[in-house]
Design a protein with these regions (language model features):
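Extended substrate-binding grooves/exosites of carbohydrate-active enzymes
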Residues: 1-119, 124-130, 135-143
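Extracellular/periplasmic ectodomains of large secreted or surface enzymes and adhesion receptors
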Residues: 77-79, 90-100, 106-107, 193-211, ...
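Buried hydrophobic-core signal for structured, non-transmembrane domains
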Residues: 117-124, 164, 177-181, 225
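Exposed beta-strand and adjacent loop surfaces of beta-rich binding modules
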Residues: 131-135, 176, 218, 236
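Local beta-strand/beta-hairpin segments that build beta-sheet-rich folds
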Residues: 145, 159-161, 186-190, 246
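Terminal connector regions
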Residues: 168-204
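Beta-strand/loop-rich accessory regions of lumenal/periplasmic or secreted enzymes
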Residues: 170-172, 199-285
Length: 285
């Protein structure tokens, strides 16, 4: 129950005499299910791994004064508060972002998109993909510019390669292909970059005409049309070029993030609060 994916794989390697199933492997409270793919990948590698179960499908909540409420909203104490909100859909049956991740992980069709070929794998046991419509969209800089539709014969537990119908000539724009399988509505979808604009390089002009100024608190670098100030405590605090300041506030590292709902329950703040302190009081040495 809630065994780490790496530990599940270790068990599967060491015990090849019986199937393995997780009664629960994902607790869908709040911002969660981001690691679900790790367990799904194990299903593709080990036939003895039978998968697991998500806790759970729908949030439990009651309407009160026109809004959905959970523990504590009715004035009761003690309470488990939001621990009843563990669903991949909200209590009013609308989807959460978690539903999209689960939908993607659980799909029976895999796509791998190359510049010339789209590789399709059908993991259904009995269904041929010719029952669905295949739609492909070409996106440039995030905008759909071309759409192609077709039917593809791909028998259960087999793979097929389809020629990518889009020709990429303009390499100054980011290009991606989105593939859909539809049957009156979207069933599967996957998007992949086929050309990503790389950061353009610029020639760096070096100069020896710089002055270094140092005092007890700061180190300054002064050159033609620019100056930089480093605080001995906070690091980079100012960078000016042609009288334009590019640093609004001192740059500082961040080793901590806000806790998710699941983090709160497993005492994340207590265990990792020291990294928040390190972020707030970091010093240059």
């Amino acid at each position: 129950m809630y065994t780490f994916a790496v530990d599940v794989e270790k068990y599967l390697k060491e015990h090849q005499d019986k199937p393995f199933i997780l009664c629960e492997y994902a607790h869908s409270m709040g911002n969660s299910n981001g690691a679900l793919f790790k367990y799904i990948d194990l299903e593709k590698k080990y036939s003895l791994y039978q998968g697991g179960f998500i806790w759970d499908y729908i949030d439990q909540a009651l309407y009160h004064d026109g809004k959905l409420c959970y523990g504590g909203d009715f004035g009761e104490r003690p309470s488990d508060y939001d621990f009843c909100g563990n669903g991949i859909v909200f209590a009013d049956r609308t989807n959460t972002p978690k539903m999209q991740e689960v939908k993607y992980c659980y799909q029976y069709v895999d796509f791998r998109i190359d510049e010339d070929v789209i590789h399709i794998s059908n993991n259904y046991l009995f269904t041929d993909l010719n029952e669905y419509q295949l739609q492909m969209d070409l996106l440039r800089n995030g905008n759909v510019v071309q759409t192609k539709t077709m039917t593809v014969d791909c028998q259960p537990l087999s793979s097929v390669d389809v020629e990518n119908p889009f020709k990429i000539n303009d390499q100054d724009q980011e290009c991606a292909v989105t593939v859909y399988l539809k049957k009156n509505h979207e069933i599967y979808a996957q998007q992949q970059y086929i050309y990503e604009v790389k950061n353009k390089t610029h020639n760096i002009h070096t100069t020896k005409h710089v002055d270094i100024v140092e005092d007890y608190l700061n180190v300054g670098v002064v050159g033609k049309d620019f100056n930089v100030i480093f605080s001995k405590q906070k690091g980079l605090v100012s960078y000016r070029y042609h009288q334009q300041e590019y640093i609004r506030v001192p740059v500082r590292p961040n080793f901590f993030r806000a806790a998710t709902n699941n983090d709160v329950e497993n005492k994340y703040g207590y265990r990792y609060g020291k990294w928040l302190t390190a972020s707030l009081y970091a010093k240059c040495e």
